[in-house]
Amino acid sequence: MIFSTLEHILTHISFSTVSVVITLHLITLLVNEIVGLYNSLEKGMLVTFFCITGLLVTRWVYWKHFPLSDLYESLIFLSWSFYLIHMIPSFLKKEKNSLNVITAPSAIFTQGFATSGLLTEMHQSGILVPALQSQWLMMHVSMMVLGYAALLGGSLLSVTLLIIIFQKDLIQVFDKRKHLLNESFFFGEIQYINEKSNIVQNASPSYVRNYYRSQLIEQLDHWSYRVISLGFIFLTIGILSGAVWANEAWGSYWNWDPKETWAFITWTIFAIYLHIRTNKNLRGANSAIVAFIGFLIIWICYFGVNLLGIGLHSYGSFTLTLN
């Protein structure tokens, strides 16, 4: 009872904190910046991160297994991964970056879906099925979910890049507010180039727009590549550890189970992305399109088996019931 109450409290504190932070930052889009709110997002994200961490630890202690046994727990861990990826660059460089624009809302929406009424039946865990009672559970599933989080974040940066490339007029909308975007822009704030050389200052408005646009595209492409590379490493480790676990549990390293097949397709798509990035002539829009395809494939891989409830990886499947 105590653990259940603590989990309930941590869930609501984390979601309420982030909701307040979002509201405050939305207000700053309509009025001038309010003193004291400049770093409110990072502080709110930090509080939420520790609450989600406490929630996972609580379930781990209470149910006596690593909290990655069903869709609800994996979504909470995915949300935790987004929070982690969000904060690491800020702690390392102490500056804003375009990654924050993606990771913050991703974490919030993932957590919101996990705590919604759709997965209520999964909030109460239970005894693991024999196949999941292995030390490989933590290694395999955590690496896969961390990989999904990084790949999704990097892919969304690529989607943003595509929007900017194919809709040039979009930049003009943001030009009304401190050269393209105010630094307090939604969720973590894209940091546009601070250098203001005399050439740029004396240039025509169209030249300035093109300059900032090219710098933004370069920054998005840079962060997308770094985050996807990290996610690809996690995904590779997850697939390899899963193969070893499958051999122990089912007597075969690879069974072409639906989850395994889609995981392999996901790995192949992002391997193609990384290969394209080695060619300078194909960077930008070409690699971003591949990343966008990978983004769609990840959701098929992550939710597909759970929704269909088929295959050897259908332990955490769920069905939607209508009242």
Curated annotation (Swiss-Prot):
Tell me the GO BP annotations in alphabetical order.
Answer: cytochrome complex assembly
Subunit text: May interact with Ccs1.
Tell whether Lyase is among the UniProt keywords.
no
Fetch the HAMAP family from UniProt: CytC_CcsA
Q: What's the source species for this entry? A: Spinacia oleracea (Spinach)
What is the topology of this protein in the membrane according to its UniProt annotation? Multi-pass membrane protein
Which family does the entry's similarity section mention?
Belongs to the CcmF/CycK/Ccl1/NrfE/CcsA family.
Q: Does the record carry Transmembrane helix as a key word?
A: yes
- Top-level taxonomic group: Eukaryota
Q: What is this protein called?
A: Cytochrome c biogenesis protein CcsA
